Design a protein with these regions (language model features):
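Second-shell loop/turn segments in exported
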Residues: 24-33, 49-59, 89-94, 139-150, ...
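Metal-dependent peptidase/peptidase-like ectodomains
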Residues: 180-251
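A non-catalytic alpha/beta surface segment that caps or lines the substrate-entry region
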Residues: 54-108
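Bacterial Sec-dependent N-terminal signal peptides
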Residues: 1-22
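N-terminal capping segment at the start of a domain
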Residues: 22-28, 33-63, 75, 206-215
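Alpha-helical metal-binding/catalytic segments enriched in His/Glu/Asp
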Residues: 114, 121-127, 131-186
Length: 251
């Protein structure tokens, strides 16, 4: 298990480390890389003003799902979900049913046996949208565009999908890329994926969740829970990903 998790963890590195970095000394050397430029473009698109913060069930969340689906198609990533994503409903107390969606892409593993086992990489589609606040005694509507939460995670998701598709010969297991809707509504998209949509949950060997990756400082956190294998991988890589030093947080 440690071996394939190591491959998965290393697949995350190219998002931050381009070929330029091998001769560089800091994050500044990454600024001109094609991958970083692509990530920035994704973040701009997914946090655009017209999406109004991608609130669960909103037109903005729908457009974000369509954007992720479009990127998967352009990158040659196969889709498990139908065009427009897989719809599901969330019952609201005393209100109408909220309709959200998941978009799931995949890159099939090369091993004839292990391709039936799965690694899941996921990121939430939605943010909190708009909120009315009181400023100087007057109601003011504020839009939470969600560049960090979670356009950053979605941007990495689609770029990782591209990289895994390009380097599919490295992956014995099938890798699923899941953009999950309605996370701010009791994580409904994740629940729907595990309990209604995907029939082979017992074959999922590892899962990485990408959330709020734009930390604003030179570092990132790896929340591994109680996964002993992943803890070992993070501890090993923390000494190798210069100048990146993951801080391990268990819970």
């Amino acid at each position: 298990m440690k071996r394939f998790i190591s491959v998965l963890a290393l697949a995350l590195v190219p998002m931050l480390l381009s070929a330029q970095f091998r001769n560089g000394t800091g994050y500044g050397d990454l600024d001109d890389s094609e991958t970083v430029a692509a990530v920035k473009a994704h973040v701009r698109s997914l946090s655009a003003a017209h999406l109004e913060g991608r609130k669960a069930g909103s037109e903005g969340e729908k457009e974000a799902a369509e954007y992720v689906e479009q990127m998967f198609r352009e990158y040659g990533v196969d889709l498990l979900t139908p065009a427009g994503g897989e719809l599901f409903g969330v019952m609201k107390d005393g209100r109408d049913t909220l309709t959200s969606r998941n978009v799931i892409g995949y890159v099939e593993g090369y091993d004839k046996t292990l391709r039936n086992d799965y690694i899941v990489v996921a990121a939430r589609l939605d943010n909190i949208g708009t909120m009315t606040m009181t400023v100087d005694g007057k109601p003011v509507e504020r839009v939470f565009y969600g560049a960090n939460g979670n356009a950053s995670g979605l941007a990495m998701l689609v770029e990782l999908a591209r990289m895994v598709r390009t380097n599919s010969m490295m992956f014995r297991r099938t890798v699923l890329f899941a953009a999950l809707g309605a996370s701010n509504e009791t994580f409904a998209g994740a629940w729907y994926f595990l309990n209604r949509s995907f029939p082979e949950t017992d074959r999922i060997d590892a899962m990485v969740n990408l959330d709020m990756l734009g930390t604003g400082y030179n570092g990132f956190y790896a929340y591994t829970g109680s996964n002993v294998d992943m803890n070992a991988v993070v501890n090993t890589l923390s000494g190798e990903l210069q100048p990146i030093h993951p801080e391990l947080v268990t819970g």
